[in-house]
Amino acid sequence: MEEELKNFIIVWISAIISVSYCYYISANIKTGVLRLFSVLPICGLFFVLPLFFSSVHFSSSTAFYLSEMASLKLILFAFDQGPLFPVAPNLIQFVCFTCFPIKLQRNPKSQPSQNHFHKRAFAIKIMIFGVVLHVYNYSHFLPQTVLLSLCFLHLYVELEILLGPLKVLLSMALGCDLEPQFNKPYLATSLQDFWGRRWNLMVSSVLRSGIYNPVRCACQRPMNSGWARFMGYLVTFLVSGLFHELVYFYITRETPTWEVTLFFVLNGVCTGTEVAVKRTAFLQRWWPVRSSVSRLLTMGFVVVTGGLLFFPLFIRSGMMERRANETLFFLDFVKRKFSIF
């Protein structure tokens, strides 16, 4: 644990120095190709940094924060696009907006409830997370379907527990309102609603600016608007799948199986098809669907496709059990350190 913490400090000091270079040097270079060339070495470094860890949590979070999010943000920043534009007024804000999955909320007064920290809901998630961690002790006795559902619940609850307080702390430290990372994904009424408006919203926002919008604009000339929109969804989900394959590689150091990429491509195809079908006059006029039914269908599709393509790799590699064991080990490590005092 001590060695991993040392690597963690070294990696994140390197990241802060790199982002500082972008703030003081790259920001003063003319927008476009020249600024892009100035940030590309930093993006390359961010893809190397997760390799310094053997911990599942450190490697996956560094890959998510730096390799995926920060790299895309800096590429968009090179063209005065994305969440880093306009440039933050000081270095601390620029570093935080680059290195963490946060985004400034432009109209905080219109959405006051999203900035409120729900203590009761958070306490319930902590309790659920504690139960999930200990259920892994009996994973060998659980049916495959139960184990897959456990992985899905573990992933969602852990992300909420980690990212929710992070958003609150950074909002207080920076003195500004930040957008939420999740918006009750279990209430999604469509795939478009789930992926675009409820699940991991910071990733959705960056991918929309960096992948979806450019692809859709590029395809509008040779194709009609419907096919351009479909290609935007397909390429965006493909890129997301490739990023997830990369995260798996950082954690397991094994050759990708491409199951996760297939999961995202399938969801991209179905989301694009869903959007196209919903825009038809026949469906709008003659096929209204109750919200309860649409929620059941949406979550059923995500859970079933995730159980077939996304989570089997978690189980085969023992990744979720490693995450659970690391969490319990870290809590024990902190307890022992504090007991000294």
UniProtKB/Swiss-Prot annotation:
The keyword Transmembrane applies. Signal peptide: none annotated. It is a multi-pass membrane protein. InterPro entries: Wax_synthase, Wax_synthase_dom, Wax_synthase_Magnoliopsida. Its EC number is 2.3.1.75. The chain crosses the membrane at residues 9-29, 36-56, 82-102, 122-142, 146-166, 231-251, 295-315. It is an enzyme of class 2 (transferase). GO terms for cellular component: membrane. The keyword Ribonucleoprotein does not apply. One of its GO terms (biological process) is lipid metabolic process. Keywords: Acyltransferase, Lipid biosynthesis, Lipid metabolism, Membrane, Transferase, Transmembrane, Transmembrane helix. It is found in: Membrane. One of its GO terms (molecular function) is long-chain-alcohol O-fatty-acyltransferase activity. It catalyses: a long chain fatty alcohol + a fatty acyl-CoA = a wax ester + CoA. Belongs to the wax synthase family. Catalyzes the final step in the synthesis of long-chain linear esters (waxes). This is Probable long-chain-alcohol O-fatty-acyltransferase 9. It comes from Arabidopsis thaliana (Mouse-ear cress).
